[in-house]
Amino acid sequence: MATKKLMLDYVFENEATYGDSVFLTQPVGGGQVTDYTWKQVVDQARRMAAHIKAQKFEPGARIALLSKNSAHFIMAELAIWMSGCTTVAIFPTEAADTVKYVLEHSGASMLFVGKLDVWESQKSGIPTGLPCVALPLSPKTSYETWDAIIQRTQPLAGKIKRNPTDLAILLYTSGSTGTPKGVMHSFERVTRIAEGMLGELQKYIGKETDIRV
C-alpha cells in the first residue's frame, strides 16, 4: 500500500512543480508587498533548518514561534520541521507571564520572534539565555536576524522525511480559563486536516485554478 504524503512531501512536490510561481505574499507597509516563490520559500527554510541542526538540539526538540501570521512564520515552521524539531505555537497577544510559562513548560530550545503588537510588554517573559532569532518585520531586538543567518548558511540538502507519528506542533491554548494547555498534533494529523481544508476550498474555487487564498 502506498505511503500517504505528509506536509513536507507536499512542500517539496510543489517546489518542484511550481518553483517560480508565487507562494507567499507579505504586506510590508505603505501599500507595498513582497512576493516569495516556492523556490525562495523552500530555500530560506532549508538554510534556517541547517542553522537549527547546527545547534545540536535533541531530535524532536521544541522550537517556539511568537509572531502574528506572516510569510516568515510559515518559513520558520517549515525550517523547524525540516530540522527534525517540533513547533511550539504561542498566541501573539499573550502576556509576559504566559509566554514564560509556555516556553518553560514546553522545554523550548529556541524561539523565533516575529511581527508583534505588544512586544514591549512581552519581552520580560523570555528566559535569559534562550537562543532567539528575529524574523523580518519583528520589533527591534538584540537577537540575531533571520536574514543574517540565511545569508551565511548553506541550505540543508535532500527531501527531508518525517514520520506520521512525529509531533509536528505543540499548540497551547490561550489560557483564558486557566493555565494554558499544550495540545499535541502529529504530522499525520496536521496533514489530513490540511487536505480536508483544501478539499472544501476546491468545492468553491475548483481544483485547477490560479486563485491564491
Task: Annotate each predicted stretch with a short phrase.
Residues G30, M110, D117-P164:
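ANL superfamily adenylate-forming
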Residues P92-K123, R152, I193-V213:
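Conserved ATP-dependent adenylate/AMP-binding module captured primarily in the ANL superfamily
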Residues L24-S70, I74, L78, A95-K100, ...:
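Conserved AMP-binding/adenylate-forming core of the ANL superfamily
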